[in-house]
């Protein structure tokens, strides 16, 4: 059986645009990796989508913004344009400690907003039917 954790975030593109105008270098270097910046430049809608993806990933990992650094989560497309998540440092350690087997990311944006949804997958070992039957029999015996 597979269990899921989901993170969702919505970002106002205008907010990212204002951050770029007021704190361009500090904001960019604190939040985005060099590869993300090469890909997106100063295009606020692309950076807002990546910002939302990082927030959604932190939620799916259960860490919040204080648990991992922004640049420990990287969002880059594959050759077909599908966004992929790359985890480093504490973000990667957290995913491994949770036993995550995959992270799936979806990005979308309109004129005013960018949003991201992250689904974290965790494979649970299949039930052992004999062990489950044994557990049930013990419970039934205890009831009598």
Where are the regions that the model predicts?
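Core catalytic alpha/beta fold that binds nucleotide/phospho-ligands
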Residues: 1-144
């Amino acid at each position: 059986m597979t269990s899921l954790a989901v993170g969702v975030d919505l970002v106002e593109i205008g907010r990212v645009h204002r951050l770029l105008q007021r704190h361009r270098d500090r904001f960019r270097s604190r939040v985005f990796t060099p590869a993300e910046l090469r890909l997106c430049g100063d295009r606020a809608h692309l950076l807002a989508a990546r910002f939302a993806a990082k927030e959604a990933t932190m939620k799916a990992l259960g860490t919040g913004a204080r648990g991992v650094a922004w640049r420990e989560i990287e969002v880059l497309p594959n050759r077909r344009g599908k966004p992929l998540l790359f985890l480093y440092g504490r973000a990667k350690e957290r995913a491994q400690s949770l036993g995550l087997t995959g992270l799936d990311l979806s990005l979308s944006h309109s004129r005013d907003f960018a949003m991201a949804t992250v689904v974290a997958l965790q494979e649970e070992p299949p039930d052992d039917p004999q062990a489950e039957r044994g557990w049930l029999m013990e419970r039934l015996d205890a009831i009598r």
